Amino acid sequence: MASFFQSFRSSSMAKQLLRFALSRLDLLDTQALDLENLDFALGRNTVLEFRDVGLILQKLERLLGLPPAFSLQKAKVLILRVTIPMDFYASPITAEIDGVDIRLKVASKKEKDRQDAGKRGKGMAGSEAVPTAADLAQSFLETQPVAEKEELEQALAAETQDLAASMAASEPESDDDSPVGTGQPLSLPVFLTNFLHGIVDRIQIRVQSVTFQADVEVAVDSNSPVPEPVTFQLSLDNINVEGVTSTSETPDEASTIVHKEGKRHVLLDNIRAALITETNVLSSLARSASMPSSSASRSPVAPRSPVDNETTAFNPSGLSRSVGSSAMAGSRDSSDDLPQSQHLQDNEAAFNIPYDFGDSNEPNEADEASPLSTPRASLYRGSPPPTITDHAKSAVLEPSPLIWSTAEREAQSVPFLRPPEGFPLSNDPSPAASVHSSSTNRSSGSSARDDLAESHIYSHEDAESMYMSAFSQTGSQGLRTGMPGAWDAFDDAEESETEAGPSTSTQAAPYDGSFDPPQPDRIPSPEQPSQDQKRNSPSFYAQDSSAEVPEPPQDDIPTPRGPTRLVKQLLSLSSISIYLPSSHKHVKIDTPDDGKSISPNIPGAFSMHSAAATSPKPTPADEPAGETTPIDPSIEIVLKPVEIQFDASIGFLLAMVVAQLLEAAQGGSKDAAGPTAAKPPSASPDVKVTVEQLSVLFLEKLAGVADVPQRFFEKSTPDLSSDVLLQAQVVDLRGSVSHDGPQTEMDFSIEKLKFGYANDDIVSFDRSVLMFESVANTFPSAGQDISVKATMGPEISRLEVNTLPLYVQLDLQKLDEVFGWFGGLSSFLNMGTSITANTSRADKSPANPVQKPKGVRFDEPVHPDDQAVTRENKTDLRINGLQVDVLGKDCSVMLNTSAFKLVSREGGIGIHLSRIRLSGPYFKNSRAEPPIVSEVLDTRVEFLPSPRAKDLERLLELITPSSNKFDEDEDEIMVDTLLRQRRKGSVLSLAIGKVRFDAGNLPQLTCLPSLIDDLAKLGTVAKYLPEDDRPGLLTLCHVKNAECRVDFGGRFGAILTSLTDLEVAHISMPQLAAVALGEIAVTRNKIEELVVTSPPPQTGPWQNLPVFRLRLIDDMEPVLKIKLMGLGLEYRVPTIMDLLNLGQDVTPEDYEAGLAASVASLGEQAHTVIKRASSGSLTSTGQAKAPRSLKVDVAFRDCLIGLNPLALPSKLTVALTDAHLEMVPGPQELVAVTTMKRVSVLLIDDISILESPGVRFTTSRRPPVVISTQVAELCTMGYVNICQISSAKATVTVSRDSQGDTQLEVEVRDDLLVLETCADSTQTLITLANALTPPTPPSTEIKYRTTVFPVEDLLASIRAETFGRAEGEYDLDNDFDVPQELGDDADSDLDFDAGPSDSPLNLDSQYLEENIVQEELFDATSSSMLREGATKFEDTNDGVLLSTAGLDNPSSSGLEISSSDLSITDDYFDKGPVGRGTAHRWDSKTDRYDQHNEIKLQRSPLKLCVRDVHVIWHLFDGYDWERTREVIAKAVKEVEAKAYERRAKTDRRGGFDPEFGEDEPIIGDCLFNSIYIGIPSNRDPKELAQAINHGLHDFGDTESIATSTVTTSTLRAAGQRRRSKSLRLDRSRRHKITFELKGVSADVVMFPPGSGETVNSLDIRLRDVDVFDHVPESTWKKFATYDLDAGERELGADMVHAEIITTKPADTPATEMVISATILPLRLHVDQDALDFITRFFTFRDETAPIHASPSDVPFIQRIVVNSIPIQLDFKPKRVDYAGLRSGKTTEFMNFMILEGARLVLRRVILYGVSGFDRLGDQLNDIWTVDVKRNQLPGVLAGLAPVRSLVNAGSGFRDLIEIPIREYRKDGRIVRSLRKGATAFAKTTGTEVVKLGAKLAIGTQNVLQGAEGLLVPQTGESSSNAAAVAAVLGDDWDEAEYEEEINRKFSLYADQPLGIVQGVRGAYASLARDLSVARDAIIAVPAEIMESEGAQGAAAAVLKKAPTIILRPAIGATKAIGQTLLGATNSLDPMHRKRVDAKYKKH
């Protein structure tokens, strides 16, 4: 092969091959290089040097594939030196480059729009790839002559044959490993290809001073139309490319460049990146407010120090490689004759530079080197290449001596700095060291692309001429036209720049006009640059970023002096080492040798091998012979310490620059996608990356240097440690990418990762913080924080990340200090948002929407072979624990978790945490247990890009449940639209197994608000998250179980809350939230239940439904819907007392005041929360809209409210079957409206029955209406349904008055309230109501005022205006209320206006004349009722008194009253009822009503108004409680036993014993103060039960108690007991008495504190009161009603009006009541059975459960006034208690008389000092009974039934006399007077006569019917009817009920005809019916006689029908007469029909 190389060497092909290769590169300017004249000689070392070589920009753009927005402005190489050794086939070719400058400009959007789109498109169409060695070889051979190619081919063929022969001859026989084969001959193209491969692999490249600049225009301020220029600069000091086959020559070099066998080492040294921009740009981005003074005093430019005195030498080291000693000697000899260039010194005056570059007194000045001015190549033979040293590295912010640099001469921004041209490039101090030949000067052309910036005013020519005139010197051979600090000129044809030689920085000295070159002895060794020089060298230089169009010359404006641009370094990288493997195998050849093969491994030469070397080369010691180290084919990249530093302004500016670069790059991505996709896939090499250390520093202020020449000479010494705000550090990052066929594997590991402050960490990894150990924990390898492993294949892609436990420490105070420099985190983020918004607003223009073509469009189906779609991506992340410490100013909170596992699949992302623990707060220097500990177990999080079907089902079930809607009439949500939106959105599903929360020691939580406020500042980051046009994220959360325990300490104790199945759904946009809760339970101290979930009904559609639902949808009128179902709330007095922190000695008034205040405060807080929610979350973002009011709608379904009294076993439960609560917040008030459609009130006497086992309560008594299944189940548990409410409405208004006090106004309306109780349940209800407040503690002090205030000055109260005109009538007794004779009676509890019977004024008005002064208190018909207004009584406006004044005394209507005595109220009808702004107040000292204060009333804290409530109260006979029935049954059993015992004693005596005669005491007992059980001696004990049943009249009860089976220990109903008629004590089937109250209105006004002694005022008004009699044996209908005979009622007058004022006199500790009551005239129809039932009902008392728990709770009535009550009474007795008569009970005489229309008046009474309402009733009964007996017996006796008609007829005769006299006195007309009297007499007398006839006829009919009933025997008709009914009803049949129905009686006076015509028709019909019955009886007699067997049978048949035949016609006749007369009565007196309808039952 040696002969072939000799042939190849002797030919010109090698030289032509090099020229061809250079020309085909097509990057260098071949015209400047003049490759045709390039010549070199083989066999000798040749040095080729090129200066100012430009790169072809278009070619470079095509190779780089730049987008259209990127344009290369300049790309030039200052010096290119190529050294070709003589043995280039074995030795490397060295390329040395000095000064690479590339400038890139990014066009703005406007400029890009103006560009020619076709220009770049044409250039890109012809893009070419870099040619390979094979391409070059083949193309080269095509251009060579055929003769030369044939000659070389022959030589190559011959060499191949000789090589094969030698290989065969020298092959040893025993060598089995020698390569053998039949190879093919080596062809010339293959040889040339391998030859080029070897040259390329051995080539070595040294590059110095590389600068890359990108100019970008950024719109910083939206108000400025001109964008600001910003330059991004990237600088590299050195780039060393090592040959693949090269080895280290010296130990020093080996330490710098680490060689790896088979790999090319590329070293990039000292890489720096910076931003250069105007100063105002950075100032506009920096904050303008809240900057500390220390920062304000700092300059944006880094501080500088004076120039160092020490002269630093310039160290060229890049081209210091020697190619041979002979070549070096030759170069030295041939360089002596080269001319030297002259030194050129810049003028300091032109730049105002106050320093010098050198010292003129320095001895041994070096000769000046010739300028590097020619662009032509120079040929050097045998000379060493001149070396170019490294320019000293510089860190702008580090203290270092700044020296001259050669790295960036052409890379500086305007103004830039060049060293003087006299500086030599060589490090040889001798003039002979320069081997450069002088030639032509540098090109003077310049490009217009480097124009002036806008701030410059001179053109280049003007500035250059001024510069040349200032620095004119002669003798310089290479005078440069560019001036230091200025810009170079370019033209379109050529780009040329001046070079900068090496320079030194010398000591500052006065300038003497000369410049001294550096001393030779001060130049350090080029091979050993000091570390200080590397670390302290200048980093980068400013770059001009002027506009393209230069400004016109302006000669009259002076040159600006101040620099306006700043340079700030962002990145500093020590070095990057890249090891590139070679794809070509090499054999090292030292010298040509015929005995050795040159290329045994050339492709195609399979049988060639190297022969044994004759003289083998010694093998190094570390590489044993015969061993070959395998070559790693991977690419290795090693990054030495990397440091990135920035501040806020630089960060925002860099973000805008990067954003604009990305936007510009995206513009060309589509164009580049086509050619790139067309390239065939190539095998990717393996890559290994190592980063020793990476530091990212966020500084408070990044110091910079001004873009002026001084920055290269001065020192900057800022202190970086104090400026670091945040930093991130990564230590030893290692990564590798390997390929195994189609599969790619990547491994990454990080030894240490930290993020935090300068001296503390925020985020770090530490194994010691792991709290929850688990066998499943898998940690990374030892010494690693993070390990990442990724595998990518055609079918699956997997990523596995494993880390140590993560430790996060958030010091909120430090964070606030860090971001406090920017005004806080919000201000910092707002600043960034505003900047980016301004930039996007300024850069972006509205894009025209693309109009889609019309028609049907189909989505392209996914191809099954598409790997990108079918590949399965899997990601597994495991963080083996997490600890987060949140540190506040006073306390801290800690969060610990178990291993954090994240799994990502194609379907979504899943996260699992088995345990999470949150605890705190922790206090500094305290080891106490944290007060709050919360744990979350089994947390699973799933994130899906699109929802699943079950997710949508869960969402719909939460917002629109199908089985249980929020509202029956709710508007349907557009489900289709919602589902369509949700299918486009993502889903976040959160499932939590269990949550435990425990809080105690609550006083320590006072520090949490400040900690939460600090965290809220960080929470503002959420609003800066990017928004998406897609529908908002759907979040679904499910918590299976949750427990919360809060220990409040003290008396209140701990609250435990348990939740089950909590589900939450939330959508961010459009806003939607829904919550569902399965069960909830809240207990206090584990014994008191506060909130419970009632068990679901066993049957029905509402099983297993959530107890709580919530839904909120953002709408035009948003409504927060809440639905509570089956929720139970418990009210307990001890809980409220402990919650309000009330003592045991609290009074009921204080308790009620505290409870009302807490309710008002709760309403106020709810108002605040709702307003915040409506104004915050529901306002649209980005638009200023008025906050919409959020309406809250709460629905209650089967909810329970339990009222538990204090120290009682009873309980009241309110069942809200269907209720609604709506809250609407207003601007100043909160309005809540509660609507109750179906509500039940249930009562139980002992709650232990609910918990005791046993059979449920069953009863056959069917309720009239089944309210709900829940109520029915509660009744089976032992409850009694006592009340039903329907259509009730309550409105609550919470507001604030002008003084800021809270006001609560409540208005209640109810259409129907039905109350159903028995005697015992009524007393239990009253007792329970009194026990809902704490009892009044006992006190020894005087509670009530019992003495009269003494009159200190009687005359002081007398006023002159009181004694006016002495007109009118005066009643002295009424004016002076307290008679003297009563004042001395201390034991009297009552005070009459006139005394009792011993008073001399006790006279009856009917026995006195009219002119005598009448007694007002006892005369309801007195005219004094009209004078009450004139005498200024408190009841002046009572219409009741006015309407009944002339009832019995018509003459009183003619009373003359002076007009002066009238009190006229103009606005009487405009005033509302009491409570709507007015209320009475009481003054105890004056014993009168005080004048009300309107202002104080308007400030009332509580106003309760009840309007138009309809109340129906059904009184049932029997008893509800099992205990009551058992007590009665036990007493009956005991009495019966005593009776039997007495009878047994009597029988043993053998006869009648006088001792046991009739006078013997009756054995008996009185139970519950209402039931008397007694057995007379002459009665059988067996009759006792029957007597009790008859007394109870319980015909409707079906259950009974057998006395023989009753036990005292049974509290539970033992199922359905056997039927027994012994006792029937359960509640009756039907009610006996009904109270119907219509138009119930009440007003409660609480007066503010300090307004007087009046605490509150209660005003009750009943519009209509009716008491119905439902006793089966009674024929009367209404027990009590309004008396129609009293006349028409005043419009709006109330039948009952009571005013109760609660006062608290100053000298008494308790409250007292002042009562005033007025009742309209009453009409009473009293049946004795109904009266006995009412008496027994209301006198029931259970001594074991007193009504008042404390004697102090008995209300004290200070004063009560009961106005006169006129009564008209009908009484029907049925039984006489003779035993009572014998015992002296005279009231039994009333039972002998039937009263009809008896009139009496319950006189006006005033009582003082009455304790309790029971005593009040007794005293009123005693007073009125005595008064009626003594004064009103004539009126009562006139109502006796036999004489009533006579009395009424007598009144007609009286009218015949009185009316004419009265009329004659009035007008004197006799005839008219007589006519009126006769008319009144005829009407009264005639009507009474007709009534009397009707009574006689009906009485006769009644007697005849009774006789018929006695004479005609009853057949089996009734029993047969009962059997028929039982057959039909089956189990529902009840004998007692049927007995009740058949025994129900109706009066013959009921259902009267309306008039005489109807009466006649009814008489005819009844007579015809009775005659028909008699006829049928007559017809039936013969048949019965014939059927009889004898005369006796015939007589019996006749006797049987005789009563009917005889009596029926008489009955018909009397009935006809009665009906006719009744019709006539109703015609004469129309009011009579109304009276009858109110009195008698019809059905």
UniProtKB/Swiss-Prot annotation:
Biological process according to GO: autophagosome assembly; autophagy of mitochondrion; glycophagy; lipid transport; piecemeal microautophagy of the nucleus; protein transport; reticulophagy
Compositionally skewed regions (Pro residues) per UniProt: 517-527
Bilayer topology annotation: Peripheral membrane protein
Skewed-composition ranges (Low complexity): 288-306, 434-447
Region (Disordered): 111-130, 288-341, 353-392, 413-458, 469-488, 493-563, 839-863, 1370-1400
Feature: compositional bias, Basic and acidic residues: 448-458
Subcellular location: Preautophagosomal structure membrane; Endoplasmic reticulum membrane
Catalytic activity: a 1,2-diacyl-sn-glycero-3-phosphocholine(in) = a 1,2-diacyl-sn-glycero-3-phosphocholine(out); a 1,2-diacyl-sn-glycero-3-phospho-L-serine(in) = a 1,2-diacyl-sn-glycero-3-phospho-L-serine(out); a 1,2-diacyl-sn-glycero-3-phosphoethanolamine(in) = a 1,2-diacyl-sn-glycero-3-phosphoethanolamine(out)
Protein name: Autophagy-related protein 2
